[in-house]
Design a protein with these regions (language model features):
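Catalytic domains of cell-wall/extracellular-matrix polysaccharide-remodeling enzymes
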Residues: 1-82, 86-109, 115-123
Length: 124
């Protein structure tokens, strides 16, 4: 199903809400200002804390993607995993079954961003 612009309430800042690349173009306070503007317009922004590194120039295979996720998830009670869905990152889809199995084995629960934002999702 398609989503209309009015129903979109969540966003992910390219590079994350604390990225340093934006500072080069908008100055030191740019991300703080962008976060405030998003919130003023009723948007919720979300960051990730686990990165698959699946969109890097090295084009990792499924096994490396899984290792990256396991490394970043270690010690986290709540994991928001950054994955990319592009033609160049076909290995991500191959890694998904093992990622899901890993998180289930570790006792994690799965939920939507809206559930997590409303604190309706149990942590590990």
């Amino acid at each position: 199903p398609y989503v209309d612009a009015e129903s979109i309430r969540y966003l992910r800042f390219p590079g994350g809400s604390t990225n340093t690349v934006s500072h080069r173009y908008g100055g030191n306070g740019i991300m703080k200002a962008l976060k405030a503007q998003a919130e003023d317009k009723g948007y919720h922004w979300i960051d990730w804390n686990v990165c698959a590194e699946d969109a890097t120039a090295s084009h990792p295979d499924a096994a490396q993607i899984l290792r990256n996720i396991r490394r970043d998830a270690d010690g986290q009670d709540t994991c928001v995993v950054l994955l990319h869905d592009t033609k160049a990152t076909g290995q991500t889809v191959k890694a998904l079954p093992d990622m899901i199995a890993y998180f289930r084995e570790q006792g994690y629960n799965f939920c939507t961003v809206a559930q997590m934002d409303a604190l309706q999702c149990e942590t590990k």
